[in-house]
Amino acid sequence: MDPEAVELEKRHVHSVYENTAPYFTDLQSKAWPRVRQFLQDQKPGSLVADIGCGTGKYLKVNSQVHTLGCDYCGPLVEIARNRGCEVMVCDNLNLPFRDQGFDAIISIGVIHHFSTKERRIRAIKEMARVLAPGGQLMIYVWAMEQKNRRFEKQDVLVPWNRALCSRLLSESHQSWGHHCEHPRSRGFQGPGSVCGCAVCFKGRCDSKRSHSMDYGSAVARTCCEAISKEGERENGLYSNFGKSFRSWFFSRSLDESTLRKQIERVRPMKIPEAWANSTVSQQPSRHPSLDLHAPEPFSTKGPNLDEVFVDTSSQRHLGWLRTPGTSDNFSGHKGGGSRRKEGGNFLDITDTGDSVAASNSSDPSARKILRRVSAFDSNDSNSEDSSFLEAQRDATDSKAFMRYYHVFREGELSSLLQESVSELQVLSSGNDHGNWCIIAEKKRSWD
């Protein structure tokens, strides 16, 4: 047992998803094309497991196979169960399945949440254990090498954006013709919504969307400063990140990219002067919630995030790497060995007894967002100062919703399997919109 890793994952993975799960109740997102294709390629009657299924997005892609989902997060499992999926709560490090029981397994956006190399290996080995010989395993993880964003370390914290979720919930309700009298998720109240209905919140702040983005900028700015100072008091919990604080705002995950789809374009923001004066190395936000369409700082304009949802035949820019003599599951060029091995970075953590704020009707951040929006109804010349003070008070809550990720270098995931999980053979690997993906097959006894 590695208590530091367990505590880190508890605070910055499990607690975050448990408290943000209500935001996913009414959100509908599309299956990623490559994952969908992998599931549809399975033989009829196959038994498929989705380890880390979340709300069950991939459990009904192929009606010709039997799919079982499991996730560590109980609230997400409950959402999937309410959607008619066969799901259960379990731990990826100790799967409650017999050996060699599944014909195929998918692990989408899970392995990068394990905070040590040993735990990542254990998670993959456990999936290999329950995979039948000849069965295939698909794994997606965040990539360190991304076209329009940069990570300076492999172990990073990424802020969860509740305001963005609330906006999409609002737009989803409106597009379905729902109003306040329609049922809402248990225990969920959208930020700034007096009655708890996301539509009401949208109606009040539709004309102030750009102001709400300014609010997000202030939160991002003060969040870094407050966390940096508190990290010093916590014996360096966050001090090991250094410049990796900058990478909070240069990242995108599978779930966050789905939230971007329906958001309207808003004006770019100016770079706040306080960014340059902060003691923590920071840069303007590239997180989807904070700066949606500012010019890309590191490259020319890249593909829109919506392109991940187009038909796979149109994804010409997707380059897949194949190991010699493997199947033709993906088209692409050959090559792509391991550039360098894992750096072994890990975060020192000290338990301060902080509790994660739950997303309920008494959520203080909800009232603060409402007050911030209301401030623009007046001609108060000090509205910007008040927003800064509000953001400072929100800094602690923002820290509570920071998610941990280990971002993988090119070739690192393949090397991890080849060196530490000998029962698996990598068939193909590639980069899919900022994520490394591999497909591996479990070796037969005579291989």
UniProtKB/Swiss-Prot annotation:
Keywords: Methyltransferase, Phosphoprotein, S-adenosyl-L-methionine, Transferase, tRNA processing
Sequence segments annotated as region (Disordered): 274-306, 320-348
Keyword Ribosomal protein appears in the UniProt entry: no
One Gene Ontology molecular-function label: S-adenosylmethionine-dependent methyltransferase activity
Recorded superkingdom: Eukaryota
InterPro entries referenced in this protein's UniProt entry, alphabetically: AlkB_tRNA_MeTrf/Diox, Methyltransf_11, SAM-dependent_MTases_sf
Any GO BP: methylation
PTM sites of type Phosphoserine: S212
EC number(s) on file: 2.1.1.-
Polar residues bias locations: 276-286
Pfam family membership, one: Methyltransf_11
Family to which the UniProt record says this protein belongs: Belongs to the methyltransferase superfamily.
Biological function: May modify wobble uridines in specific arginine and glutamic acid tRNAs. Acts as a tumor suppressor by promoting the expression of LIN9.
Record's protein name: Probable tRNA methyltransferase 9B
Record organism: Mus musculus
Gene field: Trmt9b
